[in-house]
Amino acid sequence: MQIIPLVRSKYVYAYGAVLDRLGAPRRQLLQRAGLSDRVLADPEAIIPAHQAWGFIRLAAQTEGIDDLGLVAGDLSIEAYGEFSQRLLQVPNLNQALEAFCQLALHEYSRADFFVSRSERSTWFCRGPIDGEETEKKHVELLVVTMMIATVQLAAGSDWQPPIVLLQTKDSARVEDHPLFSRSAVRFGNRVTAFEVPQHLLPQQLPSRLVPSARSDYDRLEHEFSVAIRQVVEGMLVGGVPKTVSY
C-alpha cells in the first residue's frame, strides 16, 4: 500500500486567511484542490497533504501572490494550536528546537526537521520539502517563519539569522521581505537552514501556565495514528489508494 502523507488542516487555514483578507475566492480554490470549506472548521483535523499543497499552489498562481508563504506565516508562534501549546512548555531554546522537530511529525507525517550540531555551531534545519516547485516554495516560506519565530522566543522579536539557506530557487518577493531585512538569503539549497547562536541555546523561554509536555507525546502519537487510519480507510477502493504519494 502506498503511503499517503497527511497534514493538519490548520496550515490550509493559514493560507486561506490570506485569501480572505484579499477578497479572493477561497472556497472555489479549495474545491479545485478537492477540499471542502469544512476542513477549516477543525484546525487539528488531518487531510491528505497533496490536496493541501495543491490548494497552496492554486492560491499563489491564481492570485499572483509571490510571497504567499511569508504572508501566511505572519502569525505568532503561539497561534498553531496544540503544536504551540506543547512547544511553549519547554524551559529553554535548546529544548524548544528539539521539541519542534518532534512535534512537527504530529503536524505533517513527512516532516523532516533536525538540529545539526558541532562544537562551534548549531543549525536549525528542514530537510527536502515535497510537492511541485510553487507548492514547495510557499510551504517552505511558512516553515521558515515558524523556525525563526521559535528562536525569537528566546532572542527577541527583532532577531534575524545572519544567513538563511532556502531550497526554493524563486527569489521573487523573498529577499526584500522584512523577515530577512538583515539576513543574507541563499537560494537553491538541499535543505532549509540557519545558524542559531550558541549563547541563545540556554536562554529561557517566556513562562506559560500549562502542564508538562513530556507526557503528551504518547497521546499525540496515538491520536495521529487513529486519524491516519480513518483517512486511509476512507480513501481506499478495493484496498488500493485513490491518491498518489509524493
Describe each PLM feature range:
Residues 13, 94, 137-145, 222, ...:
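Short, well-ordered alpha-helical segments
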Residues 81-86, 129-133, 213-215:
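Short hinge/gating elements
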